[in-house]
Amino acid sequence: MSQYDHNQSAGANPPPPMSTCTSPPPPIGYPTNQPSHGSVAQGKVETKSKGDGFFKGCLAAMCCCCALDICF
């Protein structure tokens, strides 16, 4: 009998303990699907499209650069 066999237990390994850890709550004001303690049920949150203002601004900047390059 080897030393390895001597150190092994005869019974089955017990299952690992169940973890009671939960994730931290979301930041204040962050919309969730679950109502919090004592909160009033709110309607569905709708998002609004911000449009393509970023792309229009980039195109305007490129046009200005090209116009300045041509003029000077």
Curated annotation (Swiss-Prot):
Compositional bias ranges of the Polar residues kind: 1-11
Supply the induction statement.
Induced by drought and oxidation stress.
Tissue specificity is: Mostly expressed in roots, flowers and siliques and, to a lower extent, in stems and leaves.
What are the boundaries of the region Disordered? 1-46
Superkingdom of the source species: Eukaryota
Location in the cell: Cell membrane; Nucleus
Q: Name one GO cellular component term.
A: cytoplasm
The record gives the membrane topology as: Single-pass membrane protein
Chief location bin: membrane
Keyword annotations for this protein, in alphabetical order, are: Cell membrane, Membrane, Nucleus, Transmembrane, Transmembrane helix
Which segments cross the bilayer?
A: 49-65
Stretches with biased composition (Pro residues): 13-29
Describe its partners and assembly state. Heterodimers. Binds weakly to CYSTM7 and WIH1/CYSTM13.
What exactly does this protein do?
Answer: May be involved in aluminium (Al) tolerance. Involved in resistance to abiotic stress.
What does the similarity note say? Belongs to the CYSTM1 family.
Under which name does UniProt file this protein? Protein CYSTEINE-RICH TRANSMEMBRANE MODULE 1
